[in-house]
């Protein structure tokens, strides 16, 4: 029986509310794992799932998108009535000299309610809603882009830890080999088979191995720290990951074709340009007539007159026709919006160029690293054969100890290079997937609870009132700005 337990850091009140239950589960799972006596193996898919669920950069971008969703609700408010209420009360005292019998005091008071219903606003509301919808779609593409960056960073961090773990093992084995070789050389020196020079050479190589091992241990500490920063918890026993070949296109042309259609940079730029077009029409609508209905009800009490109470109700239609509004400021804003639109059109072309270059670069690097991997494996085989031969020849006096040490060093360097190349192949393959716009938890199968941004928009699109906000976990909360604070539990 084997159990896995990953300590995860959570922030916010919802995650604190899960603490008691989570603690019980953690203790139970930890006890099972300790009883089993086996370390928990953690795969790349596990890492991507954790990064997707707990990375604060992703949480921040989701909150930013939910804020953008509210632009749709704001735009829809242009279809709805405005209701105003007012009330007043005062105290008056009148003294007239000579006294005419009207001296005295009274308390006039009253209230009124007014409803204003827009009928026609020059298509401004329609264009505002369309612009907000397009901006939300652009925001979703930005969220996709951040998700890709986070997942690719998680792949890089995972590959770095696996690489550095392997290098530490290689350095440890090398130190053991050189320690054994040094002891054997000292024994041979004691019986006069080798010289003091041979002993010094063996000692120097062992000292170098100690230094290299300490550097490798420092590197893995750094890699583990970066991993924890991105994923949210320290790495467990990571296993070597293979590139997911089903996600990588079969050719460069296919990759470019997919990238120009699906990369979030391009798709987001297209939606931003669409939003800009609607914004031009929205501002232009300020030059068109505006019609609205106004309904008013009032009730007043005035004890100073013969009429004690006045109750009135009215309804009217109002048409406003702009002739030269705001001294030409509206015309300037229309021209300004058009220039912004032209700029966004150029940004689409820029995004296409950048994406194409990224696809070509990442694809070329992937092919180069694959070829290098084949060469590294061949080099290791050759160096291993050479080391075996040199050691046998050194036993019969045909080779020196220095040649044995050099052969061992060449084998070690080729093994270290292979670990670096395997990491580069893994990262480059996912970089290709990211550059074509298909690096997501849905594609790699790394999360069962995928964030659905459409749910929040559907909730607030036609929301008439309410101050509570909804978080990415579906929890509704009333949060005041002056009472807000950042809380995050320490990583276990």
Give the residues covered by each predicted segment.
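Short flexible linkers and secondary-structure junctions
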Residues: 40-160, 164, 168, 178-179, ...
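N-terminal secretory signal peptides that target proteins for export/translocation
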Residues: 1-21
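Acidic, low-complexity, intrinsically disordered peripheral segments
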Residues: 8, 15, 419-492
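Sec/SRP-type N-terminal targeting helices
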Residues: 59-63, 76-80, 84, 105, ...
């Amino acid at each position: 029986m084997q159990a896995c337990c990953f300590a995860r850091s959570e922030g916010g009140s919802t995650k604190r509310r899960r603490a008691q239950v989570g603690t019980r589960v953690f203790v139970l799972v930890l006890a099972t794992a300790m009883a089993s006596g086996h370390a928990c193996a953690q795969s790349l898919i596990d890492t991507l799932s954790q990064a997707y669920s707990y990375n604060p950069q992703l949480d921040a971008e989701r909150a930013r998108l939910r804020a953008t969703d509210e632009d749709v609700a704001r735009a829809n408010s242009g279809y709805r009535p405005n209701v105003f209420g007012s009330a007043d009360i005062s105290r008056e005292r009148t003294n007239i000299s000579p006294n005419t019998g009207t001296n005295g005091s009274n308390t006039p008071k009253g209230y009124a309610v007014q409803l204003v219903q827009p009928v026609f606003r020059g298509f401004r509301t329609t264009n505002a809603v369309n612009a907000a919808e397009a901006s939300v779609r652009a925001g979703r593409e930005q969220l996709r882009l951040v998700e890709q960056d986070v997942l690719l960073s998680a792949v890089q961090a995972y590959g770095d830890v696996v690489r550095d773990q392997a290098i530490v093992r290689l350095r440890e084995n090398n130190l053991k080999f050189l320690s054994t070789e040094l002891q054997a050389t000292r024994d041979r020196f004691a019986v006069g088979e080798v010289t003091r020079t041979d002993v010094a050479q063996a000692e120097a190589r062992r000292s170098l191995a100690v230094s290299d091992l300490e550097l490798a241990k420092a590197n893995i500490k750094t890699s583990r720290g970066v991993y924890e920063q991105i994923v949210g918890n320290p790495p467990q026993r990571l296993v070597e990951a293979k590139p997911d070949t089903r996600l990588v296109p079969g050719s460069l042309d296919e990759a470019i074709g997919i990238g120009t259609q699906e990369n979030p940079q391009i798709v987001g730029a297209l939606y931003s340009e669409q939003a800009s077009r609607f914004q031009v029409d929205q501002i232009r609508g300020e030059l068109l007539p505006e019609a609205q209905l106004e309904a008013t009800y009032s009730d007043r009490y005035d004890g100073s007159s013969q009429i004690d109470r006045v109750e009135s109700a009215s309804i009217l239609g109002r048409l406003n026709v702009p002739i030269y509004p705001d001294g030409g400021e509206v015309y300037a804003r229309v021209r300004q919006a058009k220039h912004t639109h032209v700029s966004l059109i150029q940004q689409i072309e820029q995004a296409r160029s950048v994406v194409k270059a990224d696809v070509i670069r990442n694809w070329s690097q992937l092919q180069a690293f694959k070829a290098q991997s084949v060469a590294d494996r061949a080099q290791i085989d050759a160096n291993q054969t050479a080391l075996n031969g040199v050691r046998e020849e050194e036993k019969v006096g045909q080779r020196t100890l220095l040649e044995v040490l050099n052969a061992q060093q060449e084998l070690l360097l080729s093994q270290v290079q292979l670990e670096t190349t395997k990491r580069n192949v893994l990262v480059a393959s996912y970089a290709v997937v990211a550059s074509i716009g298909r690096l997501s938890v849905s594609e790699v199968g790394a999360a069962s609870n995928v964030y659905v941004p459409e749910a929040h928009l559907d909730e607030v699109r036609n929301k008439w009132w309410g101050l509570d906000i909804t978080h990415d976990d579906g929890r509704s909360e009333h949060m005041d700005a002056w009472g807000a604070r950042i809380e995050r539990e320490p990583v276990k």
